[in-house]
Amino acid sequence: MFLEAAIALLALLLALLCRPWRMLGSRAGPGGMQDPVLSPLLTPLLAVLVLLPWVWALPELHKMPLQLHWSGAPLVLLLIGWPLAVPVLIATSAIAYALAPALGLQDALGMAVWQGLVPATLAMLWGAAVRRWCWHNIFVFIFLRGFLGTVLCVFVASLLGQWAGHVLPNVNDELSRMARWLMAWSDGVTTGMLTAVFVVFRPHWVATWSDAIYLQPPGNPES
């Protein structure tokens, strides 16, 4: 529990140093600052706070032989960025703790770290590497960041959580790794699909997306 608390506090401190609330400020509208518009990131942020706590609490609201958890943290990272994702994921865990009476405080803290903060942080680092060393186009963003990156980040984070003591009850290590691998793929498929939809139809909801970077003309040598 002390490891999870230290990770959560460190991540929250670093995120707050980035002043993430600036991303939610009003912006100049068609009439300039006299006609401000709300930040487009408010929509995905509120959607995460409404939907994701139920997803995290669901395994504790019913009794199943194999309790599997869906993360969603890489998707949150793609939508609102790491500085905002950190407090939002911690709040998600707190809401899930309130929704599920069977969820203990230690389990809720572990959920915040190993289901939320760690995969989101790994996804941020993966995204920085992809932007630095891979081609800049829409397919690379959707496939490497939305799909493949999510699979790898969620799986690695779940293995780290297992190493830290958050194991699946009544399941041996080999079967547990297989279950976590399969759940990472479900995370990847869902995140990749939603990333593709949002990038095409609601790009202003995706904080990590940039038309200037990923929609360069085909003849540009930097593409």
Which positions does each model-derived feature cover?
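Interfacial loop-to-helix junctions that mark the boundaries of transmembrane helices
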Residues: 1-4, 34-39, 106-111, 176-180
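Hydrophobic cores of alpha-helical transmembrane segments in multi-pass inner/ER membrane proteins
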Residues: 8-16, 74, 78, 116-127, ...
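Alpha-helical membrane segments and adjacent membrane-interface helices in multi-pass membrane proteins
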Residues: 49-123
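Hydrophobic transmembrane alpha-helices
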Residues: 1-76
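Membrane-embedded alpha-helical hairpins and interfacial helices in multi-pass inner-membrane proteins
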Residues: 1-6, 130-201
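Flexible, glycine/charged-enriched surface loops at secondary-structure junctions
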Residues: 32-36, 136-138, 204-209
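Short helix-perturbing small/polar motifs within transmembrane alpha-helices
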Residues: 14-22, 96-161
